[in-house]
Structures are given as C-alpha cells and as structure tokens.
C-alpha cells in the first residue's frame, strides 16, 4: 500500500481527506506560490500551484519509497479575476460586497505525485456559487468574526457564510477546499483502492 501525504496545513482539507482515507501523513508545503505567474487561465494556474506544492513536499521525502503526495490549491474567481485571501478587514469587506447578489466560481487544482516514479496526474474542479444580496451590516458582522481572513474569496461555505449562498452548481466539497469525488477518482487512477 502506498503512503499518502497531504501537502497542506489546511485543517479543512485534513478533515475532508479523513472522510475517504483513514491513514495519511501531513507535510506542509513551503512552495512559493508567487513563483508561478497567473496568465489568464485559472484552471491551469490552480493545477500548476497544486503541482508546485506536491513537488515541494516530495523533495523533503526523496529517500522514502512508496509515497504519493497530494497537492491542492483552491481559489475564488469573480469576473475572471482571482480573489485570494483578504489582506485585511477592508479587503474582506470589499470582496464580499463584490460577491453579493452575484455568481462566482471556486476552482481547485489537484496534483498527485508518485515520488518513486515521478509520475504525476493533475486535474481541476470548478463550482459555481451564487450569493444572495447582502447588506453592509451582514458583511461587516461576518468580517468582524475573523472567519474570512484565512479563506480565498473571504468566506467559508461550511461556516457562518453558508447562509450567504443562494445556490451552488457543482461539488460542495470543492468550495470547502478539497473536491472529494475528483480526488477519489485520481487516487484510484494512481492505484489506491479506497
């Protein structure tokens, strides 16, 4: 059996991975995301970021055979512009104000790297999310909880911001941060039977 390593510090990703895998390791990637410039193709961009995270971790464990490293990156896009994690409360407020009464996309790139053979597979998932119309009071109250500060697009669907979501088209777990259905298929492609 292959040793599975998640290249992420995200507690949300760790919790989600536990739903399909009982045994895995966590090694946090030190990959510099700014080393990959965005060039208008969001799906390629998130897959390249996921690969960078997986390769960064694989370099730390080169002497160990039988490892598969999972890299993942999730981002929010609105009007073909990437909304990363907010810099401060004002930035979070402005992001949420822009998303109010609008549809946006959540992209996750996945990369699974077999450390021994250097074989890698990459894919992505895109989910459309529509927010209801939010008042300034709702946005400010949510921003003041601190919840949006470590999340792409300044919200977490699994938390208090879940009430902002009018509808979703696609994988819910993608919006949380780890598209389980796609990951499951990719792991099976790499020989992991779940």
UniProtKB/Swiss-Prot annotation:
Enzyme Commission number(s): 3.6.1.9
Active site: 73 (proton acceptor)
Any Gene Ontology biological process: nucleotide metabolic process
Compartments in which it is found: Cytoplasm
Gene Ontology terms: cellular component: cytoplasm
Reaction equations catalysed: dTTP + H2O = dTMP + diphosphate + H(+); UTP + H2O = UMP + diphosphate + H(+)
PANTHER family, sorted: BIFUNCTIONAL DTTP/UTP PYROPHOSPHATASE/METHYLTRANSFERASE PROTEIN-RELATED, BIFUNCTIONAL DTTP_UTP PYROPHOSPHATASE_METHYLTRANSFERASE PROTEIN-RELATED
Protein name: dTTP/UTP pyrophosphatase
